[in-house]
């Protein structure tokens, strides 16, 4: 199993190109099921989850071609199977996103519940409740969501803000009979990106980027060409890496307007930030200052950046509080950071961080995707060597992270075994 070996190597300097957003690419790939035409996607990150989605769509009969660099062609005209099996779904929660488009186009769908998916901690109940409101008959049997029925437009008010639920119901509504009003929608940039692609495919959607979207169903959608929005979380991760090591790095193919709160927090921590339409520059010449963090839904501070800022705060001047309001049990990186010498205590959904002068390298285990990133960031500023194990988590969301960081001066290498 691969590991990352990391040692401090001074300030980072240079340029990094940001990949397309995984959290946008996965629903966009699933949108290919809505049409018999060809959906051409550009700026797609070549990640483990993207490859799993490719296998899932191919298993349903879709024709999926890729240049293995950043482009995909998905043709749903050959789909001959409306079942998404456990073998593929178990590794990736986003697989549930085939439910809405498959049901809407074919009138039936069977999708395995994602592995470890408690209808509690990260629920799919809002997806199912919304589809039932649109006329679907749904049963959960033998670990599968089995849905059938012709969808009809209606008013759907989601009980909580859910990105996946919004995306699933939005895709389903494009082919439903009549008008669907989706209320309490997530407004993340990745949701907006999906909606804009659906419009290119012939969907009639108003209210994009707001909490209420109105979808007028059409008989069929057609193919189109679409470029995936840049990954704001990958960009934020690299910015935190520079903030902890010092230096000056320019991010290309970035989308600063999608991550303004993160940029504001970096400025508060002492970084100098410049930005244009598609680039961000960070210049850090001092020890970071501790900054309080409270995760909330977009456009607030993203939960997916909480762990990276925890690493930054661990070596910052002063103390701070980090409050996690989105997901439970999302402080699993704290014990690993403490093994490196951090001074972090937790109480419920709040972490109290007292900055230390320097961390020390250690063997640490990645427990999830963003926790992995926080350990990499910590290792870049730690005394001695840090070894991050179980980096398959990291590969789910970061494309060649060791090569990108290495290109700006980080001492980081991937090793097997």
UniProtKB/Swiss-Prot annotation:
<dbReference type="InterPro" id="IPR050068">
    <property type="entry name" value="MurA_subfamily"/>
</dbReference>
<dbReference type="InterPro" id="IPR001986">
    <property type="entry name" value="Enolpyruvate_Tfrase_dom"/>
</dbReference>
<keyword id="KW-0132">Cell division</keyword>
<keyword id="KW-0961">Cell wall biogenesis/degradation</keyword>
<protein>
    <recommendedName>
        <fullName>UDP-N-acetylglucosamine 1-carboxyvinyltransferase</fullName>
        <ecNumber>2.5.1.7</ecNumber>
    </recommendedName>
</protein>
<dbReference type="GO" id="GO:0005737">
    <property type="term" value="C:cytoplasm"/>
</dbReference>
<dbReference type="InterPro" id="IPR036968">
    <property type="entry name" value="Enolpyruvate_Tfrase_sf"/>
</dbReference>
<comment type="pathway">
    <text>Cell wall biogenesis; peptidoglycan biosynthesis.</text>
</comment>
<comment type="similarity">
    <text>Belongs to the EPSP synthase family. MurA subfamily.</text>
</comment>
<feature type="binding site">
    <location>
        <position position="326"/>
    </location>
    <ligand>
        <name>UDP-N-acetyl-alpha-D-glucosamine</name>
    </ligand>
</feature>
<dbReference type="GO" id="GO:0051301">
    <property type="term" value="P:cell division"/>
</dbReference>
<feature type="binding site">
    <location>
        <position position="93"/>
    </location>
    <ligand>
        <name>UDP-N-acetyl-alpha-D-glucosamine</name>
    </ligand>
</feature>
<keyword id="KW-0808">Transferase</keyword>
<keyword id="KW-0133">Cell shape</keyword>
<dbReference type="GO" id="GO:0009252">
    <property type="term" value="P:peptidoglycan biosynthetic process"/>
</dbReference>
<keyword id="KW-0963">Cytoplasm</keyword>
<keyword id="KW-0573">Peptidoglycan synthesis</keyword>
<comment type="function">
    <text>Cell wall formation. Adds enolpyruvyl to UDP-N-acetylglucosamine.</text>
</comment>
<feature type="active site" description="Proton donor">
    <location>
        <position position="117"/>
    </location>
</feature>
<dbReference type="InterPro" id="IPR005750">
    <property type="entry name" value="UDP_GlcNAc_COvinyl_MurA"/>
</dbReference>
<feature type="binding site">
    <location>
        <begin position="22"/>
        <end position="23"/>
    </location>
    <ligand>
        <name>phosphoenolpyruvate</name>
    </ligand>
</feature>
<dbReference type="GO" id="GO:0019277">
    <property type="term" value="P:UDP-N-acetylgalactosamine biosynthetic process"/>
</dbReference>
<dbReference type="GO" id="GO:0008760">
    <property type="term" value="F:UDP-N-acetylglucosamine 1-carboxyvinyltransferase activity"/>
</dbReference>
<dbReference type="Pfam" id="PF00275">
    <property type="entry name" value="EPSP_synthase"/>
</dbReference>
<dbReference type="InterPro" id="IPR013792">
    <property type="entry name" value="RNA3'P_cycl/enolpyr_Trfase_a/b"/>
</dbReference>
<keyword id="KW-0670">Pyruvate</keyword>
<keyword id="KW-0131">Cell cycle</keyword>
<feature type="binding site">
    <location>
        <position position="304"/>
    </location>
    <ligand>
        <name>UDP-N-acetyl-alpha-D-glucosamine</name>
    </ligand>
</feature>
<dbReference type="GO" id="GO:0071555">
    <property type="term" value="P:cell wall organization"/>
</dbReference>
<dbReference type="GO" id="GO:0008360">
    <property type="term" value="P:regulation of cell shape"/>
</dbReference>
<feature type="modified residue" description="2-(S-cysteinyl)pyruvic acid O-phosphothioketal">
    <location>
        <position position="117"/>
    </location>
</feature>
<feature type="binding site">
    <location>
        <begin position="122"/>
        <end position="126"/>
    </location>
    <ligand>
        <name>UDP-N-acetyl-alpha-D-glucosamine</name>
    </ligand>
</feature>
